Swiss-Prot record:
The lineage of its organism: Eukaryota, Metazoa, Ecdysozoa, Arthropoda, Hexapoda. GO terms for biological process: mRNA export from nucleus; mRNA export from nucleus in response to heat stress. This is THO complex subunit 6. The THO complex is required for cell proliferation and for proper export of heat-shock mRNAs under heat stress. Coiled coil: none annotated. It comes from Drosophila melanogaster. The keyword S-adenosyl-L-methionine does not apply. Signal peptide: none annotated. SMART domains: WD40 (SM00320). InterPro entries: THOC6 (IPR042626), WD40/YVTN_repeat-like_dom_sf (IPR015943), WD40_repeat_dom_sf (IPR036322), WD40_rpt (IPR001680).
């Protein structure tokens, strides 16, 4: 099988991000490629297909696990490191040279370099929180690349980390716990163990938590246990969602809850658990969903397939956008070796 065909068959997109201008969508995969879509292409009529994507290879040794966007930089979370690439909007181009790079420290008893599995950006304070495969959440200053502190408590790798405007951080991990942290305290302030709730436990799928989301009043999480919503003050489960698969993504979208994972549908519910939309997807598993309401309203769902699934009204599937096989200049280029990315001086953790 040719490399191009192999990538089309086994494309696994774990990460997406939207540019600060809300005009570009970035998608990164485990082959080390970053795709860029002009969001205005989604506003074309249904008869006219979206334009081709741009691709920016990072090298076959770079697993792109998570993406975030801050100021003029696309932030990439990979294996053992986080780095920033400058985005030139006029030229619609990502820099080939990394502007900065932060290495995740290896623990004394570690046998492998930890993955950066999830990131949450506090854009107002230019701080990034990275949940990693060593069970630690790292607080990184984007001003100087310094790791400011480590949040320790999880006993297995962190799958998801999110935060809110109140200085709280929420993390879900393989150890089956959801922990709530304060940037002003050393230890977690509270902890949930959803698998201990008989209404949530699914014994065949384990206790791990694959995704966490939060808004002003509610905490949403799921994984092996069923997806459920908890009130932030009481930390009591108020609603259990009927999503039938393992949960790898969840989010509050407008006044609804979006849930996806190892299932052939992504589902949208009311906060009371009423199913509103059952959206068919071609992904073997869905790992990422990003959305915005303006200037162009859409959700993009990605996972283990070669297609981005686009919803314009948040309830119905509007289009599927191919990635490999739909890249500018691809039909003219021979198979090439991976482009090498110039690497700057590395900021080591203290």
């Amino acid at each position: 099988m040719k490399q191009k065909d192999l990538k089309r068959a086994y494309n696994n997109v774990l990460a997406q991000a939207i540019s600060g201008s809300k005009q570009y969508l970035f998608a990164g995969n485990l082959f080390g490629d970053i795709f860029v879509l002009r969001i205005k292409e989604l506003d074309k009529g249904s008869e006219e297909p979206p334009g081709k994507l741009k691709i920016f290879p990072q090298g076959s040794d770079v697993d792109i696990n998570y993406l975030a966007f801050h100021r003029d930089f696309l932030i990439v979370g990979a294996v053992g490191l986080i780095y920033g690439l400058e985005w030139n909007e006029e030229e619609e181009s990502l820099a080939t040279k990394r502007s900065w790079e932060v290495k995740i420290p290896m623990q004394v008893d570690a046998v492998e370099v930890p993955d950066v599995n999830s990131m949450w950006l506090d854009s107002e304070n230019s701080i990034l929180f990275a949940g990693c495969g060593d069970g630690v959440i790292y607080q990184v200053s984007l001003e100087d690349g310094r790791i400011q502190r480590e949040y320790r408590g999880h006993t297995d790798y962190v799958h998801s980390v999110v935060g809110n405007a109140n200085g709280q951080i929420f993390s879900g991990a393989e150890d089956g716990t959801v922990r709530v942290w304060s940037t002003k305290q050393q230890q977690h302030t509270s902890m949930l163990e959803p698998y201990k709730n008989p209404n949530l436990l699914r014994p065949d799928w384990g206790k791990w938590i694959g995704a966490v989301a939060v808004n002003e009043d509610w905490l949403l999480c799921g994984g092996g246990p069923k997806a459920s919503i908890f009130h932030l003050r009481s930390m009591e489960s108020t609603c259990v969602f009927s999503f039938p698969g393992r949960v790898h993504l969840c989010d509050f979208v407008d006044d609804c809850v979006l849930i996806g994972g190892e299932h052939n549908h992504v589902q949208s519910y009311t906060l009371n658990g009423v199913l509103q939309a059952n959206i068919p997807v071609e992904h073997t598993a869905c790992y990422s969903a990003v959305w915005q309401t303006s200037p162009i309203k859409f959700i993009s769902i990605a996972g283990f397939s070669n297609k981005l699934h686009i919803l314009k009204d948040f309830r119905f599937l509007d289009s599927k956008i191919e990635m490999y096989g739909n890249v500018e200049g691809e039909e003219n280029d021979p198979e090439e070796e991976d482009e090498l990315i110039e690497k700057p001086l590395t900021v080591e953790a203290a």
